[in-house]
Amino acid sequence: MANFKVSRVETTPFEGQKPGTSGLRKKVKVFIQPHYLQNFVQATFNALGADRVEGATLVVSGDGRYYSKDAIQIITKMAAANGVRRVWIGQNGLLSTPAVSAVVRERVGADGSKATGAFILTASHNPGGPHEDFGIKYNMENGGPAPEGITNKIYENTTTIKEYLIAEGLPDVDISTTGVSSFEGPKGKFDVDVFDSTSDYLKLLKSIFDFPAIQKLLSSPKFSFCYDALHGVAGVHAKRIFVEELGANESSLVNCVPKEDFGGGHPDPNLTYAKELVARMGLSKTHSEPNPPEFGAAADGDGDRNMVLGKRFFVTPSDSVAIIAANAVQAIPYFSGGLKGVARSMPTSAALDIVAKHLNLKFFEVPTGWKFFGNLMDAGMCSICGEESFGTGSDHIREKDGIWAVLAWLSILAYKNKDNLGEGNLVSVEDIVRQHWAIYGRHYYTRYDYENVNADGAKDLMAHLVKLQSSIDEVNKLIKGIRSDVSNVVHADEFEYKDPVDGSVSKHQGIRYLFEDGSRLVFRLSGTGSEGATIRLYIEQYEKDSSKIGRDSQEALAPLVEVALKLSKMQEYTSRSAPTVIT
């Protein structure tokens, strides 16, 4: 048993270590500066306080992006020096964000210990590699992201930090092999437990879904399946879950070997970046696929996001969460007793609202950021929730969960096809979506992302939109001058949320223009990029007339798109003639 001692290292603050909704994200070149990561980790320990750190059991893992392995060793040594009793690390340092949440909530160590929190090393859907992004966030004992009270303290601490603690004489831990390594320090024993990355997560998923029913679907010659992990950490879980447990053919897995640079790609599961899957599913504009699979899905870098596709058919994330909620009680055993409630982020379409109304469910509209859902779940008020940004999840953990969403869709397909895997036509993904629209109406929806725009220009654009809201009459005059065929604005505001659980108020959560016919325009500045500002524009139109629900989305939304771009003076403020990504 190796002994270590504790060193106090003098340091000075770095500017800009303010964690956003998903932790601290910066370029790798920023993180590898001497003391940079250490300052943030020590600021986190100090914010948590001795009672939450000394004797604690912490999970330290991530999506495997460049610099993760070095960061794991640094955090482990700092944990030892700060009096943490145990560090749990997924084999090779790999755990998806939902798997971390599952481990914190469910795993019991060999000595009966339970995790009290986690450092997750991820920048989610942002690119990885020496010249790309790295990130770190802290999750609490409920498996969810640290609340603002903690993240604000972390930031305050980064502005005044003078020293950090690190173990001296503690060797690097071999994270490629499972097993427990024990060490002795000034405060007693310190253990590092490297464990199988998928077992605890899989056990939880098997308690939620009817795996034999999904297996029956996947083994049917009628059904074909494709899963693309975009070289992110979800690939670690995919083979075990889809191939070994559910019997899918290994050839159905694409890009499922995790890579530090995500294979040079952008690990964001949308129609722009998941090119290989999009082509395979028959949705490429340049490549014709004669026989696409029935079902396809993609994950992001840390496995918490998902994109769902049918044969030549894209399911919007806003529709996806609504359809899962509408079918959950029948198709997913975990929900057989009913749903406690449902929730969506404000920019997400109102498709879920209509389902909640029909099914008489509690409904919540929250700001962007999974922690708001976590509060509702901890209070027993919400079972299923989702975001338009390809995040879907439930109260089984406190993070969004990409593989959970895929299994939810496979469960719905298995349920709808339980009597026709032999004779009869398969009920397809497209059939399920169109049946949903026929019952609940369709929310035509698109999102325009303007990435890495000049921060001052972005702020000026938002200020312009807020100023316009002072006179709805003036706004409607401007709109009629742009398009006479667009409905009137009846309400305009900056979205503000009062949490029904703790009473906290979140202001300035996005600018909204709500129209008489149920249409919406929403503008947000996003804080998850590592450089510049990202403006997100959300455009939504509700159509109840069943004869009009089959139109092309961009065609149906064209009048509102024109209004949004001209009303906001998008090109004038951003110098961009087109968005970076259209979803």
Swiss-Prot record:
GO terms for molecular function: magnesium ion binding; phosphoglucomutase activity. It is found in: Cytoplasm. Mg(2+) binds at residues 124, 300, 302, 304. The active site is at residue 124. It comes from the Eukaryota. Binds 1 Mg(2+) ion per subunit. The keyword Heme does not apply. GO terms for biological process: carbohydrate metabolic process; glucose metabolic process. One of its GO terms (cellular component) is cytosol. Its cofactor is Mg(2+). It catalyses: alpha-D-glucose 1-phosphate = alpha-D-glucose 6-phosphate; O-phospho-L-seryl-[protein] + alpha-D-glucose 1-phosphate = alpha-D-glucose 1,6-bisphosphate + L-seryl-[protein]; alpha-D-glucose 1,6-bisphosphate + L-seryl-[protein] = O-phospho-L-seryl-[protein] + alpha-D-glucose 6-phosphate. Belongs to the phosphohexose mutase family. Catalyzes the reversible isomerization of alpha-D-glucose 1-phosphate to alpha-D-glucose 6-phosphate. The mechanism proceeds via the intermediate compound alpha-D-glucose 1,6-bisphosphate. This enzyme participates in both the breakdown and synthesis of glucose. Monomer. This is Phosphoglucomutase, cytoplasmic. It comes from Solanum tuberosum (Potato). The lineage of its organism: Eukaryota, Viridiplantae, Streptophyta, Embryophyta, Tracheophyta. The gene is PGM1.
